[in-house]
Amino acid sequence: MLCALLVLLIAGVSAFLRLSKAGLGCEPWPSCFGEALRALQRGAAVDDNAVQTVALARLAHRLLASTALVLALLLALGHCTAKPLHKGRAALALGLVATALFLAGLGLLTANSRLPAVALGNLLGGFAMLAVSWRLAAPERPGDAAPRAAALWALVACGLVVIQVALGGLVSASHASLSCADSLDCLRQAARQGWPWPTLNPWREPAYDVASALPINPAGALAQALHRVGAIVASLAVLVVAWLLHRQAERRAAATLVLLLSLQLAAG
């Protein structure tokens, strides 16, 4: 449980760093959005550590990530040497260590990268660590397997949530927040552009419309549209899982899912 809470804290600090770098909440808004990226693309030097809050957050992120790696190693050691050996949990613990090492290497090798793929790697890796560490913290309940329909819907919902997380990360890392105003506007712009699927390539550096007075990435409309539509589809799948849990008398789990979904929709 400690590792799961620590990973959740790391995810929060990482999100703060990512959104601060993008310029969300900057002044004067919205003309300041993406100023760091635009300065780098002009060849100017940018030191976001000059902002004390960002510098402290980056230091906290490194300390927390190092602590999480140590905890993951201890978890793996404990599960791999346990008697009797639980192969499933040992494999999960080793996967947790592998993911932590991957994220550590990604951070070292891509510290100044402007590619959305790097942000997606950090985001999805962090969520994977959170899911695995939470699963390791959950108590075993033998003989309490979920019915086939509930298990299938849970798998579908998890897949949709992962896709939704990736699309949200792509919108953020592509500086697409100002690409369109609402769902209909995003769909109209994406249709007007001929549904440009190559713009979803995370290995493309974001580019701004030089003719616009605002820092708008016109290629971000499709990602925005998919993210908004995906939110509806993923929410419906999660609600189906919550309903199935409620029918199985798992009312606490069902209520937790609905609460988390409500908080996410309110935040979005």
Task: Label every PLM stretch briefly.
Residues 1-268:
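Polytopic transmembrane helical bundles with strong interfacial aromatic enrichment
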